[in-house]
Amino acid sequence: MTTTLERGFSEEQEALVVKSWNVMKKNSGELGLKFFLKIFEIAPSAQKLFSFLRDSTVPLEQNPKLKPHAVSVFVMTCDSAVQLRKAGKVTVRESNLKKLGATHFRTGVANEHFEVTKFALLETIKEAVPEMWSPAMKNAWGEAYDQLVDAIKSEMKPPSS
């Protein structure tokens, strides 16, 4: 497994991620929902991966379960990115990582889904902090996201019996 430092999450990247997250944090509810709405705009079929959306007739923006889920995913992703350099690895608790891996495996999440999610995340951040956005910031968030996804994928396997 490649470590963070081998993959090159630099001090500069960390600073860009921390600075932008500090600005976005206060709007994490709104941004989390925007993030997921972007995912479903790009890939409407992704809705069927979520049991609480599968048979729902409620508009996405009004679904009572979507916003809390979206916020928790957005905040976990951003918090993980902020901690990446300091910890030298993804800092989601191992039990949570196993649960995330098992859930993503069980629901049939594929590589394409992670790519769509990455694009939606970067677009959400770009819109949230347009005055800070730069190619360097895009690369920093992209690298942090890729490392989180690698950690989740390493746990995407059938439950051990």
From Swiss-Prot:
A matching Pfam family: Globin
Reactions performed catalytically: Fe(III)-heme b-[protein] + nitric oxide + H2O = Fe(II)-heme b-[protein] + nitrite + 2 H(+)
GO CC terms of this entry: cytoplasm; nucleus
UniProt cross-references to Gene3D superfamilies, sorted A to Z: Globins
Domain Globin positions: 8-157
Alphabetized GO MF terms: heme binding; metal ion binding; oxidoreductase activity; oxygen binding; oxygen carrier activity
Cofactor annotation remark: Binds 1 heme group per subunit.
Keywords: Cytoplasm, Heme, Iron, Metal-binding, Nucleus, Oxidoreductase, Oxygen transport, Transport
Residues marked Homodimerization (site): K138
Major subcellular site: cytoplasm
Transmembrane segments: none
A single GO BP: response to flooding
PROSITE patterns: GLOBIN, PLANT_GLOBIN
Cleaved signal peptide residues: none
Positions contributing to heme b binding: S51, K65, H69, K99, T103, H104
Cell location: Cytoplasm; Nucleus
Protein's job: Phytoglobin that reduces nitrite to nitric oxide (NO) under anoxic conditions (e.g. during flooding or in waterlogged soil) and upon root nodulation. Required for general plant development and during nodulation, especially for the onset of symbiosis. Monitors nitric oxide (NO) levels during early phase of the nitrogen-fixing symbiosis and buffers oxygen in functioning nodules. May not function as an oxygen storage or transport protein. Has an unusually high affinity for O(2) through a hexacoordinate heme iron because of a very low dissociation constant. Involved in water stress tolerance.
Similarity comment: Belongs to the plant globin family.
Assembly mode: Homodimer.
Protein name per Swiss-Prot or TrEMBL: Anaerobic nitrite reductase Hb2
Organism: Glycine max
